[in-house]
């Protein structure tokens, strides 16, 4: 549309207005000429005067941007409202802009000479001052749009297109910067100069929007490539036919698809295809052949997968570097994986070093790996017996249903006729387990020479078995002459008692005791409720004696001699030593509480009684006061007479059958345990 309509700043908003009059005003600065405009606000018919610096050219993009911001604000307001004057003014301006756009599209054919004439703008000299930073974005946009427009307008021949594209690509930055500064100055200072530019604006915006959308999609693809480390295929970078015809000719598109297919084929898995070095060389050869057939400029623009016309050749170099970097990373990962395998298996790592040092020594392969098979008869395992450390043993037999095995320890006088030990399979460890070295070091603390001899014997057996010089079980190997060079190292007199022993001379006496103790210990015994019941009954007696002080009068009468006591008479006539004292209370806390109370009662004793007992406080409290207090409390709590209460006290706590059996078995076990060392001597 013509330049008589502008966007002016009024009431802190940009209002569309019609220019009525323009007047220039002199300024103090010689370089700047300010002008004031008399405008009329659309849909309001209100005339105002504004400065030219506060106005902008009325364009479709500016109006749509303002309306979109108002739409966002209206979404926040939930309540319905009427259309404001500002919104009506913007809608009117948008309709006027659209009508002007239709007119400009009809006159595009007449504007083509004007667009092509922009090529002849002279280049900016190299010593020209740099542009401002805020102008860089517009200059880049204008540069891309102008280059694509030049390419789309010249449809006569393929050769002319290529030459025109690259000449404009080389001289475009300086020309577009100059044009951008001129256009920017015109838009900000003088709206009247926008009459001619408005007609070109819609055409440029269409092309710029298409270019920007393609550029944004390609930038996202390039970032995705860097993150995922692969070259995208041609299908990922295709554009619809309508846009591709307006942007680039058909020949470069074909070349780009071919080059992208080549790069995609080169990015196959290195494990399935050729080696990494061949992969890179194969990619370079394919790329060079494409460049020789089509041309350096076209192949560069096509293989990069980008739809910009003037693209630097360093993009192809970066793709080659990306391939080489991926190959190096794959090699490093394979090296790390092999290093981890060697670190997890130290035996295999040591074997590989030995193979490199001495090629003549060829050990069997199966001794370098951990055993993964199940337990079998004749297998060598680790077994811990009683107080001894883990020791190499041989499985004599296995009971699969019970999951138990009979094992025999490896020792100097080993014989298959000896009786083994039956143990659970869970207590056994494979000989080549991961803890093998730790088990050997633990056994060396007390049996250094013996465990070294066992390890050498087992190693010799497995080497001969792997080389084929011997076939048979470990027991057969130990009894054969082939094992004599290893067996002769051990002298029976020297190593008689430094091997773990499964049995000794008292094996016949130990087995019945062990079985009986196991039978008693593994019985499922329910908790005994008789003792807690007795403790609760005794708690009532303690409360009666200590808290209620129900026996205090009876005890004070005995201390002062007013009451006769059978226990006092026996105390005075007794000998100096008393073998046993019946306490009746089984809980020590209850007994301590009663004794402390009786000691307080003892302080009230008279001098005559103190002389009779010879001032023996502890013995008098335990043998006289304690029985009298318990009997008196039983009589009062249970409702018995003194004789019946005394008989219950003398009988003691009533033990159950289970308590008696446990007590008797404990006494017998302690007695037999003490008798065994005496028989050994």
Swiss-Prot record:
Stretches for region Disordered: 102-144, 166-200, 285-304
UniProt keywords, alphabetically: Phosphoprotein
Phosphoprotein found in the keyword field: yes
Pfam families listed in its UniProt record: MUM1-like_PWWP, PWP3A-B_C, PWP3A-B_N
Residues recorded with modification Phosphoserine: 128
Residue span(s) of domain PWWP: 377-438
Biased composition (Polar residues): 102-121, 285-302
InterPro entries for this protein: MUM1-like_PWWP, PWP3A_3B_4, PWP3A_3B_4_C, PWP3A_3B_4_N
Family stated for the protein in its record: Belongs to the PWWP3A family.
Protein's recorded name: PWWP domain-containing DNA repair factor 3B
Lineage: Eukaryota, Metazoa, Chordata, Craniata, Vertebrata
């Amino acid at each position: 549309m013509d330049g008589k309509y502008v966007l002016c700043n009024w009431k802190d908003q940009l209002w569309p207005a019609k220019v009525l009059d323009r007047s220039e005003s002199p300024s103090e600065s010689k370089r700047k000429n300010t002008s004031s405009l008399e405008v009329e606000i659309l849909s309001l018919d209100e005339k105002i005067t504004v400065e030219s610096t506060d106005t902008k050219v009325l364009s479709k993009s500016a109006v749509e941007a303002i309306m979109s911001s108002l739409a966002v604000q209206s979404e926040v307001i939930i309540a319905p409202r009427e259309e404001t004057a500002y919104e009506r003014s913007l809608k009117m301006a948008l309709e006027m802009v659209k009508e002007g756009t239709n007119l400009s599209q009809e006159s595009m054919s007449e504007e083509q000479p004007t667009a092509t004439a922009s090529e002849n703008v002279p280049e900016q000299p190299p010593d020209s001052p740099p542009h401002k930073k805020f102008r860089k974005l517009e200059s880049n946009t204008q540069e891309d749009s102008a280059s694509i427009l030049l390419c789309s307008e010249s449809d006569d021949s393929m050769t002319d297109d290529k030459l025109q594209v690259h000449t404009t690509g080389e001289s475009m930055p300086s020309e577009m910067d100059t044009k951008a500064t001129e256009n920017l100055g015109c838009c900000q200072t003088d709206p009247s100069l926008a009459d001619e530019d408005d007609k070109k604006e819609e055409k440029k915006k269409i092309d710029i929007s298409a270019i920007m959308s393609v550029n944004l999609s390609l930038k996202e693809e390039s970032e995705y490539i860097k993150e995922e480390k692969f070259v995208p295929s041609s299908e990922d970078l295709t554009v619809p036919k309508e846009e591709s015809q307006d942007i680039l000719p058909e020949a470069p598109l074909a070349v780009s698809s071919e080059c992208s297919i080549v790069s995609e084929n080169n990015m196959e898995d290195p494990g399935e295809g050729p080696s990494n070095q061949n992969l890179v060389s194969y990619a370079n050869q394919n790329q060079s052949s494409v460049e020789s057939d089509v041309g350096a400029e076209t192949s560069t623009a096509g293989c990069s997968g980008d739809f910009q016309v003037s693209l630097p050749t360093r993009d192809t170099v970066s793709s080659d570097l990306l391939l080489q970097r991926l190959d190096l990373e794959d090699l490093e990962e394979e090296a790390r994986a092999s290093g981890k395998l060697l670190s997890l298996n130290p035996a295999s790592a040591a074997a590989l070093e030995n193979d490199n040092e001495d090629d003549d020594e060829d050990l069997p392969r199966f001794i370098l790996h951990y055993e993964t098979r199940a337990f079998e008869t004749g297998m060598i395992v680790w077994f811990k017996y009683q107080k001894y450390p883990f020791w190499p043993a041989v499985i004599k037999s296995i009971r699969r249903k019970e999951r138990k095995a009979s094992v025999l320890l490896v020792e100097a006088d080993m014989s298959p006729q000896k009786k083994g030990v039956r143990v659970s399979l869970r207590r056994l460890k494979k000989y080549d387990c991961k803890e093998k070295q730790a088990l050997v070091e633990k056994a060396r603390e007390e049996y250094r020479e013996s465990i070294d001899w066992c390890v050498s014997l087992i190693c010799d057996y497995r080497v001969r078995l792997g080389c084929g010089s011997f076939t048979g079980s470990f027991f057969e190997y130990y009894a054969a002459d082939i094992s004599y060079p290893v067996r002769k190292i051990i002298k029976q007199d020297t190593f008689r008692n430094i091997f773990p022993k499964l049995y000794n001379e008292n094996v016949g006496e130990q087995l019945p005791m062990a079985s009986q103790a196991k039978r008693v210990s593994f019985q499922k015994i329910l908790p005994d409720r008789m003792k807690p019941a007795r403790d609760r009954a005794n708690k009532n007696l303690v409360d009666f004696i200590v808290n209620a002080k129900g026996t205090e009068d009876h005890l004070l009468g005995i201390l002062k001699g007013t009451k006769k006591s059978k226990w006092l008479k026996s105390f005075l006539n007794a000998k100096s030593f008393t073998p046993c004292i019946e306490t009746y209370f089984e809980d020590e806390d209850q007994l301590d509480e009663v004794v402390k109370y009786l000691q307080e009662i003892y302080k009230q004793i008279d001098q005559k009684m103190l002389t009779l007992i010879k001032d023996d406080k502890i013995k008098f409290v335990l043998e006289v006061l304690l029985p009298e207090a318990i009997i008196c409390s039983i009589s009062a709590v249970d409702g018995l007479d003194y004789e019946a209460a005394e008989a219950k006290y003398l009988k003691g706590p009533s033990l159950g059958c289970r308590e008696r059996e446990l007590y008797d078995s404990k006494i017998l076990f302690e007695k037999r345990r003490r008798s065994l060392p005496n028989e050994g001597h």
